[in-house]
A protein has these predicted regions:
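Ribonuclease/tRNase effector modules and their secretory precursors
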Residues: 1-78
Length: 78
């Protein structure tokens, strides 16, 4: 999977003591629970709810970049 993690998402991972493997698990086994549209850019964003490797429920907010890669906006425990 080709993805880019924003600085904000990286900081949130650290704040919640999550690893990049937790993020990948959220994305790979999670499901899209909400579709959003950014009010300024009109880009589509998706809320993906899944579980960390330790089984904690978490969400990632993602969008697709211009080159088709996945851009991780933020991630947090639910």
């Amino acid at each position: 999977m080709d993805y880019v993690v924003s600085v904000h998402a990286s900081e949130e991972l650290d704040d919640d003591n999550l690893t990049i493997l937790d993020l990948e698990n959220i994305l790979l086994i999670g499901e899209i629970v909400e579709r959003q549209r950014d009010l300024q850019t009109r880009e589509r964003k998706f809320v993906v709810r899944g579980a960390t490797l330790d089984g904690f429920e978490a969400e990632a907010i993602v969008k697709f970049g211009a080159l088709g890669n996945l851009f991780i906006i933020t991630v947090y425990l639910v």
